[in-house]
Amino acid sequence: FKMGKLDAHVIDFIKNDIRTSELLEAVKPSVEILLDIHNLTIELKQDCIIHCDKRWTTEALTNIIKNAIEYSPDGSVIEIDSGENPMYSWISVKDSGMGMDKTEYAALFKRFENSTNENGFGIGMPLALSILKGQGGDIDVDFGGMGEGTTFILKFFK
């Protein structure tokens, strides 16, 4: 349903200046049980102001963080960072997982690629990308190499 609306471009994104810490507080209720089950912590390195639609960006960030939870070993840290440069503001989410091979990247943002725990993805990542693109943004991936974890960078262009 949400993807259909995003695909049809019928959503009016209402952008405001929001702190990264505020977005994380909004994400918390959706992920805190999963964090507890896996003994994971979220660490915010740097707080920044992001110009975005709070409701929809919270949804995108929730999906990215749920993905990080799924691929991080129990007891590890998920690092959130944010900042800005002349072209865009950004939020990054770095997991402590095994990392991702570049060949897996093609399936990452495809809808309903088999959602097994091995290397498949559901609707969450494609939805996150559609939300960012709907706001004139994008998502980049820093693979880091096998055993290094993966970093997702949500970009909000100025």
Feature locations, PLM:
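Conserved catalytic submotifs in the C-terminal HATPase_c
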Residues: 14-17, 39-49
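Short beta-strand/loop element within the Bergerat-fold HATPase_c
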Residues: 75-87
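Short conserved segment of the HATPase_c
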Residues: 100-112
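A residue-level detector for a conserved hydrophobic packing site
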Residues: 20, 57-58
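Detector for a conserved hydrophobic position within an alpha-helical segment of the HATPase_c
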Residues: 132-133
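Short helix-loop "hinge" at the ATP-lid/N-box region of the Bergerat-fold HATPase_c
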Residues: 68-69
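Acidic ATP/Mg2+-coordinating residue in the GHKL
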Residues: 95
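Conserved glycine-rich
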Residues: 137-138
